[in-house]
Every structure is written in structure tokens, then in C-alpha cells.
Amino acid sequence: MVAALCCVLLGSIDLTVVASILPGMIGDLGVNTADIDRYIWAVNGYLIAYIVAIPLIGRISDLLGRQRTFLIALLIFLAGSVLCATADTLGTLVVGRAIQGFGGGGLLPVAIALAGDTLGRRGQLAGIGFVSAIETIGWIVGPIYGAVITNLFAGQDEPWRWVFWLNVPVLLVLLVVLRGFARSSSTGSLRFWRHLDIPGIGLLTIALVTANLALASGGEFGAATGTGLRAMGGTHNPLSSYIPLLLLAAVIATVLLVLWERRSSEPLLPVSLYRQRPFQATIIANLCIGAVLMVTMVNVPVIVALTTDADDVATLSATLLAPYTIAVAAASLLASRLSDRWSERYLLAGAVILAAVGALLIALLQDRDNHWTLVPGLVIGGIGAGLLLPALGTVPIMVADPRHRGGAASSALMFRLLGMTIGVSALTSLAVRRLQSLSNQLEPIVREPDESTASFLARQQTFILDHAIPLSIQVIEETFLVAAVIAIAMLPAIWLIGKFIDHRHEIEVPAD
């Protein structure tokens, strides 16, 4: 079980590890920083594959056997890590990240199921909670881990590759350990595929991919040629002309998925849970907090990349994110103690307000000449998020009957990840569109016929410093304002969750 938890931790670390190393990655791969709607897929590719893998691999483990399925997921994660480490184009990197994400996402539900199988019915709840906590710790420390590794290998060319190369020996050791354990374990039928909800997983994948393609590409929709980001040296997004069709495909796939899951004898998702109001509230809250978390994890390194020397980006990004991640972790640990003293409704409502205030402070206090002005907002926002996460993970387990607790825990995490991927796609699109609007009057950077290369590059650099960077930072500040609004929007759902927990406490600990 310890080896399985190590695998889950590694998979969740890679969820956010690119946050601090993304600027270096796109620079080494020759991607223009203006093409954010393209390179954001190094994040989205992992998240979408991770989400799809959770219900699919979880179901396969029921049919094929836990250990065998876990080893397959581990091998997929290993293959993705190697592909990321050797990628020489953005497309290859995105494919590698997607393969990684599918393997990493598959590790989580199998580990949760293993915890239930190993610990028995009495220890099931604690085991599921512990696996979920390990997964949360992983994506919290991911950006810091990425920066530490790139600093350790700073003398090497393209040190970010070592973040993925170091996965290989660790995974090989874990494979040997787990393979020995799997030999002594029973396995399921090799005809497992007959019992899989293939239409369900297909519709879920189509809905996620098309929705995110549309959202991430929406910033350029309707923009004139040579304006906005294109004036800053970015390239045309070929999908921008197909956004209505992509959105239509996403809506149709989602509707068909809901209809299919209602009628399926072996649904991909635990349909009965979705009828319960506390679970519905956790879906909304997890979607919102996922978006808020990812805005912070991605945009802080982007601010640093825009205003700092390239060699210092990873270190400074991790240094700034450290207070945020520490605050999230510390508040998560304190949440249970605080809930013993205070009403859960007021505690969670206060946490929402803290998350919103933190995002507001980042937007209002950000100073490109002094990055430390970000820290107060990061700490306050981290405390708010940390106080929310335990409740959002435990309520689905409390609602579900013992047979469905693993599926409930996986579903809660899946919707948080869905919030991350939709949030980063939608806010990226809004940011690009806003930047298009702000920079619409800028003349494109075009080399004159008789202009020397040195003169053109100098003019381009001046343009970037005087126009592109200030406008980009302004837009990023505005995304934090949107994040604050998203945080406040989940207040009704959070209040319902707090009310449910308070009611359960009253039943379990009746007044004297």
C-alpha cells in the first residue's frame, strides 16, 4: 500500500509540476509566449486525461483486478514521462502529458479501491480520506518540486527535462515492488472490456476535449488579422474559426452522456449520488475551487516570467507559490480542529471570503517591480482554499453508502480537476480576448524591407517592454478579479455543505 501511495503522490505532483517550469519549457521548445492558447495544453492535456482515467481505470480495476490494473496505469505513466522528457516540439510534449495524465489519473481510483480492500469496512473511510489527502498534497507541492529539480540541474541544458527523467528510476523501482505483490494477488477476467461503459467514456472524452478546445481558442474568435496577440508575434489559432461547432459538439456530447448514464446498467459515474443535494453542492464547490486554485498556480509563474530574467523564473515562481501551498496545507490540517469549535457553515463561508479576498489582493497589490506584494494575497487565499478542501472531499463520502464511497471520493476529485481544466481554459480565453481588445490598436511588428536584423530585434524588444508586458500583466490581474467572483459564486453551495455537516454532527453528538 505504501508503494501505491508513492505512485499516487508522483502522479498528483505532475498535475501542477509544470506551473513553475512552463516558461522555460516553452522557451526551449521555441514557442512564442503570445501563443498561450496553444501551450496551455501542456497543462490541459494532463488534466483532461487524468479526469477521463479516474472513472474508466477505476471500473477496469473492478473487472481486471486491482494490482494488474495498477501496474498497467503505472506503465502508461512511465511511458508518458519518457515522452515528455524527450519532446522536441510542443505537440509531442502535449501528447506526452496526456499519456502521463491518463496513467496518473488511473492510479488514484485503484489506490482508493485498494485502501478499501486492504483496510476492510471499518477502516475504509479513513483509508479513502488518506489517499485523497496524499493526492491533494501532491498537486500542492508540484510547483515547488518542479523549481527545486530545475535548480538542481541548472547547469544542464534544458533542466526542466529532468523533472520527467527522474520519474523513470522511481517508477521502475515501484514497478518491481508492486509486480512482486501482484503475482500473489488474484486477478479478474481478461474479458473485462465487455462490462465497460464504452459509450459513456467516449462521450465524456468528447465533451471534455471539445469544450476545452473551444474555451482555450475563444480569445481570438472574431479578431481582425494582425491585431492583438498576433501583433505581438503570436500565430493564428486555426481552431478559432470552429469554436461554435466545438461548443455545439460539447453540449451534444454532454446531453447524450447524461441520458446514457441514466439508462446504463453499468454506469461510468455513480448516478444515484448526483440526485442528493449535498453531493450536488460539492460538485459546484469543487468546480469553483478548482478554477480558483489553477488560476493561482498558473498565473503567478506567468507574472514572474513576464517581469524576470529567464534563469530566475522557476526559482522565484516556486518561492512565491511556497507561502500559498504552505497556507493551503496548514489550513487543511487545522480545518477539523476548527470545525469542532465553530459551526461548519460559518467556518466554510469565512473560508470562501478569504479565498475571494486573497484573489482581490493579488489583483490590486501586484507590482511588477516588487513581486513580494503578491504574498499577502497568496497567504490569505491559500488559507481560504485549505479550509475548504477537507469538507469538499469528505462530504461525498459521508453521503455515499459504503459500497460507493470509493466512487464518491473519486467523483469529488474529478470535479475539482474538471474545475481546474475548464477554469484555466475559460480564463485563458477571456484573458486572450481581453488582451486582443486592449492591444487592438497596436501596429503589427513587421520587418521593413531594408531593416537589419539587429534593428528589427531591438524594435521588437522595445515594443514588448513598452506595450506587450504591461498589457499582459493588466490582463492577468483581471483574471484574479474573475477568480474572486468565482469564489463568491460558490457561497450558496458552501452554505448548504456546511449545513449538512452541522446536521450530521448534531445527530452523531446529541446535546445533553
Task: Give the residues covered by each predicted segment.
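Hydrophobic transmembrane-helix bundles of small-molecule transporters
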Residues: 152-284, 471
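Transmembrane-helix exit segments and adjacent C-terminal regions of multi-pass membrane proteins
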Residues: 1-6, 182-187, 240, 256, ...
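Membrane-interface helix termini in secondary transporters
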Residues: 24, 55-59, 63, 148, ...
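Helix-loop-helix hairpins in multi-pass membrane proteins, especially solute transporters
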Residues: 62-200
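Cytoplasmic loop-to-transmembrane helix junctions
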Residues: 38, 123-130, 316, 404-411, ...
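12-transmembrane solute porter fold
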Residues: 2-20, 43, 237-246, 253, ...
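Central cavity-lining transmembrane alpha-helices of secondary-active solute carriers
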Residues: 43-58, 108-113, 322-335
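Extracellular/periplasmic helix-loop-helix junction of adjacent transmembrane segments
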Residues: 21-52, 315-319
